[in-house]
């Protein structure tokens, strides 16, 4: 019998149907419950998992590692200094070697093409832990967190504030509209999402009944907001743009004034982390000294408020990643969704 997920890679949200994406979210909730009750779920007993990290990570590495162990698999971390992707060895050759030694591969790096080549040539499921274009495993955690708080996804309005061109904004647009979530991007015109991403999201929205709004008008952006979401102003590899981004994005900071504009006491705040909400980091101190800004994309007040759900969201990275690995590699009985 054909299995829906077995052997498939998880590279971008657009590769999955609404039903498939929603199934993974619900399966994640089930695995979270099993974990909470101490029920073993060793669906990947005896499997070996390669964790390839071109870009450093706290949550993604921790989530994949603990998820693999919970599933009975052995995770092996291979950092930027351990792998030769495209340097001394082609991605194709590396993929073919790793595919003979490992049962599944996670990749977190810069190029979407690279993760696609790993999937094409390795012969095993490959999971995208983040590229410059997409962040699909983050989306499962985000929308699971939203569903936990509201009991549904369809009809919810999510407002993303900040750099509208980054991977998180791209993925929020596509995954959200795929599942009937209204997605507002509140961003300066210079950082509006790419036109092809917006068109893709609008196509999904037409099918799901959702709507897409890309605007630099705060009153338009916050209308009907159930979820405020933000991300760092400067992504990995863009550190030279700090001054430009601080000046450009200060009006798009998530603060209590913005929260109150939504006039919804039941709304929640999400952030994929890390967050620059104070000066308790080297980056935070550096930005404060150079630009006079002590809080960047979110104020400390909002970050620590009753609206905040980002630590639930971070925990959900592990449960959702576990669901993806189990569904695609665990030979589970999932004939259709």
Curated annotation (Swiss-Prot):
Primary enzyme class: transferase
Record GO biological process: arginine biosynthetic process via ornithine; arginine catabolic process to ornithine; citrulline biosynthetic process
Pathway in which the depicted protein is active: Amino-acid degradation; L-arginine degradation via ADI pathway; carbamoyl phosphate from L-arginine: step 2/2
An example Gene Ontology molecular-function term: amino acid binding
Pfam family, one: OTCace_N
Catalysed reactions, semicolon-separated: carbamoyl phosphate + L-ornithine = L-citrulline + phosphate + H(+)
One GO term describing the cellular component: cytoplasm
Described function: Reversibly catalyzes the transfer of the carbamoyl group from carbamoyl phosphate (CP) to the N(epsilon) atom of ornithine (ORN) to produce L-citrulline.
Record family assignment: Belongs to the aspartate/ornithine carbamoyltransferase superfamily. OTCase family.
NCBIfam families: orni_carb_tr, PRK00779.1
Protein's UniProt name: Ornithine carbamoyltransferase, catabolic
Taxonomic source organism: Streptococcus agalactiae
Gene name as annotated: arcB
